[in-house]
């Protein structure tokens, strides 16, 4: 019946994904995002057919719910399920928003397991569901201090046991960021944001006190703190964060007053913080496309990529995907660097470059032969997408210091071996052509 259910935010990012049939693949997720959410013209029909796949979709606020199937199903039944799903989520955690969905993703998957059985709707009555799933949803952001009440009263640290000993004290810190971009053919940034995580691996003896400092000035836009002078400075000295969440070990009072992160770390690997920013983003690459139609049976495509970071840095795992029309019969490709190949099954030219230094550029040219067609509708020109990995944080986040103190075992910051690494990766990095 229903092959898969996907919940997207307004940018086309998948928040919830559940696949019930083997014939629904990853390409279905991308097809809906490109042809419906990012469509140049507003899609009015609630049912969209793409490559023999039907997408039944509803929109609540800025959230899209899409049921996908390749079978001939009862459309009324599918929409009944989608609206019931919206009602059930509202009953459990209130308003359907990106924040609430992220906070309650475990609950949503439990609800889907009860409501759908191999893609067939079974039980969607809220009253009946609450007898099976008694978990209460998180309706709004709660103060993180509440999660630390027990440990503050009893004096116990629930996330770390006592008596931990290591022969060598080490601390590894990774700043992992995903940069998302949608750019116009003229080079205008239509939307851009960075989602980041600070991941730490702690191999420290005893109960160490850690202090972690970032850029000289941090402005939390969501809280409305900071002044215009702070946000106007370069990304190296200041960073404007739209929202952030911390591990329960972080003392939030210190962060509010000093903008430093103080904590007793759990043993091993954990996520210290997660954040999102939309201002002063360093875009690692710019894609400049040029598509020229030569009659009705030929296209000439030229794509230039320019790296926008220090020459001493190297980007890796670079991949550019240039879409081609469905009636493509042959492609001739010439690239300055790397390797390029036309993949007919994906209707795209895939250009791969192993490494590329900063402040460099490279280009690819292609001649695309087209089969004659009676279809008068022009090619939609899907956006060119790009994947890459760079050794810096596109948000401009910098680690200023990382200090460790352990008064009981009498070892100090100088006795700890510390490693800091920055990794920036592409999320949905697209340029319209």
From Swiss-Prot:
Residues 168-432 form the MHD domain. One of its GO terms (molecular function) is clathrin adaptor activity. One of its GO terms (cellular component) is cytoplasmic vesicle. It is a peripheral membrane protein. InterPro entries: Adaptor_comp_med_subunit, AP2_Mu_C_sf, AP2_Mu_N, AP_mu_sigma_su, Clathrin_mu, Clathrin_mu_CS, Longin-like_dom_sf, MHD. GO terms for biological process: clathrin-dependent endocytosis; intracellular protein transport. Keywords: Cell membrane, Coated pit, Endocytosis, Lipid-binding, Membrane, Protein transport, Transport. Transmembrane segments: none annotated. It is found in: Cell membrane; Membrane, Coated pit. It comes from the Eukaryota. Its main location: membrane. A 1,2-diacyl-sn-glycero-3-phospho-(1D-myo-inositol-3,4,5-trisphosphate) binds at residues 339, 343, 352. Belongs to the adaptor complexes medium subunit family. Component of the adaptor complexes which link clathrin to receptors in coated vesicles. Clathrin-associated protein complexes are believed to interact with the cytoplasmic tails of membrane proteins, leading to their selection and concentration. AP50 is a subunit of the plasma membrane adaptor. The complex binds polyphosphoinositide-containing lipids. Adaptor protein complex 2 (AP-2) is a heterotetramer composed of two large adaptins (alpha-type subunit and beta-type subunit), a medium adaptin (mu-type subunit) and a small adaptin (sigma-type subunit). This is AP-2 complex subunit mu.
């Amino acid at each position: 019946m229903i092959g898969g259910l996907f919940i997207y935010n307004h940018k086309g990012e998948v928040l919830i994904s559940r696949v019930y049939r083997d014939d629904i693949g990853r390409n279905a997720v991308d097809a809906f995002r490109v042809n419906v959410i990012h469509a140049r013209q507003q899609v009015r029909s609630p049912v969209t057919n793409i490559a023999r796949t039907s997408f039944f979709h509803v929109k609540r606020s800025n959230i899209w719910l899409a049921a996908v199937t390749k079978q001939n199903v009862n459309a009324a039944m599918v929409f009944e399920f989608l609206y019931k799903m919206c009602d059930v989520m509202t009953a459990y955690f209130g308003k359907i928003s990106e924040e609430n969905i992220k906070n309650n993703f475990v609950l949503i998957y439990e609800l889907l397991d009860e409501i759908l059985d191999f893609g067939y709707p079974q039980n969607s009555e809220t009253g009946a569901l609450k007898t099976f799933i008694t978990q209460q949803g998180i309706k709004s952001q709660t103060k993180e201090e509440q999660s630390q009440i027990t440990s503050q009263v009893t004096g116990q640290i629930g996330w770390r046991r006592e008596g931990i000993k290591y022969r060598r004290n080490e601390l590894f810190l990774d700043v992992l960021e995903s940069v998302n971009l949608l750019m116009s053919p003229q080079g205008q940034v239509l939307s851009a944001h960075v989602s980041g995580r600070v991941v730490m691996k702690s191999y420290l003896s005893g109960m160490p006190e850690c202090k972690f400092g970032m850029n000289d000035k941090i402005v939390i836009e969501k809280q409305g703190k900071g002044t215009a002078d702070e946000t106007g400075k370069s990304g190296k000295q200041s960073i404007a964060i739209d929202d952030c969440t911390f591990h329960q070990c972080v003392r939030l009072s210190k962060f509010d007053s000093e903008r430093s992160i103080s904590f007793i770390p759990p043993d091993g690997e954990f996520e210290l913080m997660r954040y999102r920013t939309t201002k002063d983003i360093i875009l690692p690459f710019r894609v400049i496309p040029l598509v020229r139609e030569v009659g009705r049976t030929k296209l000439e495509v030229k794509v230039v990529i320019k790296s926008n970071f220090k020459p001493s840095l190297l980007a890796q795992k670079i991949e550019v995907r240039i879409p081609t029309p469905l009636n493509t019969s042959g492609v001739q490709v010439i690239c300055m660097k790397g390797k390029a190949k036309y993949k007919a099954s994906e209707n795209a030219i895939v250009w791969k470059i192993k490494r590329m230094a900063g402040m460099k550029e490279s280009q690819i040219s292609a001649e695309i032969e087209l089969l004659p067609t009676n279809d008068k509708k022009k090619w939609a020109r899907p956006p060119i997408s790009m994947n890459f990995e760079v050794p810096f944080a596109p948000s401009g986040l910098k680690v200023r210091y990382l200090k460790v103190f352990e008064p009981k075992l009498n070892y100090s910051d100088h006795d700890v071996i510390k490693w800091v690494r920055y990794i920036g990766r592409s999320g949905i990095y697209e340029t319209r052509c």
